[in-house]
Amino acid sequence: MGRKWANIVAKKTAKDGATSKIYAKFGVEIYAAAKQGEPDPELNTSLKFVIERAKQAQVPKHVIDKAIDKAKGGGDETFVQGRYEGFGPNGSMIIAETLTSNVNRTIANVRTIFNKKGGNIGAAGSVSYMFDNTGVIVFKGTDPDHIFEILLEAEVDVRDVTEEEGNIVIYTEPTDLHKGIAALKAAGITEFSTTELEMIAQSEVELSPEDLEIFEGLVDALEDDDDVQKVYHNVANL
């Protein structure tokens, strides 16, 4: 499945801890999910999943409640999902997933970031075909064979189950992520550090220090944009 999840999550954790924007971005995602269905997570599986992810990211309860209350109060903002793909230096690729109430603003901002930070924005599909949309489940554990048996019995379509640094890391088909979570909960596993849909690069590149500095600036600028929810790339040494 490419580089170890421990390496990916170390970078994600460092970025999450370095910015206060993560709370605001989860607030938008929770609001959007609540607006698209019932504002009750027990009646809205999409909302329930976002809230679970927010809790894993240690988003405070008051941030979650505020977003749901805003949706209940009839907030009139409509958010649209988007995906932008492009290239950095020396074979590096990048995908930015967005959630925005103003598509024109987002397109302009993302294009400007690519242009100013040494990248080139591409057409839809120009990069994403080199990534696999994958369900990722991570929790504390050291027996991947036992976990694989649990998932197999529940007929979950699993790509891989590994043990990394005291964690079980499960990669599923994207359509079976929720089924996998349900199977684990039924087996008594209820504490997860990650339950995400991720775009994982099929192959990776290593950049020189000079190119890495440029690419990191591009990634950081995209992640700092209010409308960008997730950034994926294929650089092994970032």
Swiss-Prot record:
One Pfam family recorded for the sequence: Transcrip_reg
Coiled-coil stretches noted in the UniProt entry, renumbered to this chain: none
Subcellular location: Cytoplasm
Keywords: Cytoplasm, DNA-binding, Transcription, Transcription regulation
Annotated GO MF terms: DNA binding
GO cellular component: cytosol
InterPro entries reported for this sequence: Integrase-like_N, TACO1_YebC-like_2nd/3rd_dom, TACO1_YebC_N, Transcrip_reg_TACO1-like, Transcrip_reg_TACO1-like_dom3, Transcrip_reg_TACO1_YeeN, YebC-like
Gene3D superfamilies to which the protein is assigned, alphabetical: 1.10.10.200, 3.30.70.980
Protein's GO biological process: regulation of DNA-templated transcription
Predominant location category: cytoplasm
SUPFAM superfamilies, per the entry: YebC-like
Protein family per UniProt: Belongs to the TACO1 family. YeeN subfamily.
Protein's recorded name: Probable transcriptional regulatory protein YeeN
Organism per entry: Escherichia coli (strain K12)
